[in-house]
Amino acid sequence: MKQQFNQNMDTNPILIPLDVPTSEKAIEIAKNLASHVGGFKVGLELFTYGGKDVVQEIKQFGKELFLDLKFHDIPNTVAKAVANATRLNVDWMTIHCSGGPEMVKAAENAAQETAASLGIKPPVVLGVTVLTSMNQEQLAATGVNDAIEDQVARLAEMTVSNGLRGLVCSPLELPRLKSILPDSIHLVTPGIRAKTDAMGDQKRTLGPKEAMDAGASRLVIGRPITAAPDPAQAAQNIFESLL
């Protein structure tokens, strides 16, 4: 049967974070879930073990690859890191919005120019606003006393005005961001939990269907799938709940 998608879906939006210590374990998870999800996220833990080789191995499954290293440094350093990441032909990558406008512009320019030189599609560089593991008290401890949603909106507008085509945000911020940003901006949301799921590190969460209905482009869903008794069935169940 042909799959039917809701108005915010043109593909399977589920991205699985491969937050495991070895390439072997990551490949095992990817092999089990590849037919049930839209892609996989390689973060710091796995990348510092397997490097570019594990990225290429995960890409063999033919799914989207999200390289989540959250670059945050001086503009020149970030530009060079983004250029190298673009050479891996990933679909998504992250930088921290708090690096400022010059860093943001340098990152987007590096992605576009490197992709053009290689004749490949440029990755979507996503700006990370406020980590979904943070609550209001933790944000204040960093010296930011504004409400989380105000800080997210401020960083989002700055980032988009300097060229980025996407953001990472909690699902709770989706309605506000959709109201202030162009429709073309991709919004990728971790912090996806059903009411019955353990929260883990996540503080600002929403269910998968609610997040898609609020305007998410992609859903990063970890433990509700990977820690389930049958991860493949859990992924399929969540996907079907979105249709």
Where are these regions (language model features)?
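Short, acidic/polar
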Residues: P21-L33, P75-N84, I148-M158, K203-E210
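Structural motif
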Residues: S35, F61, L88, N162, ...
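C-terminal helical cap(s) of enzyme catalytic domains, especially alpha/beta-barrels
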Residues: V104-T114, M212, I225-L243
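N-terminal amphipathic alpha-helix/helix-capping segment at the start of soluble metabolic enzymes
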Residues: M1-E28, S117-I120, L174-P182, L206, ...
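Glycine-rich phosphate-binding active-site loops on the catalytic face of alpha/beta enzymes
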Residues: L88-P101, G191-K195, D201-R204, P208-A234
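Hydrophobic faces of well-ordered beta-strands that scaffold small-molecule active sites
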Residues: N12-L18, F40-V42, L65-L69, M93-I95, ...
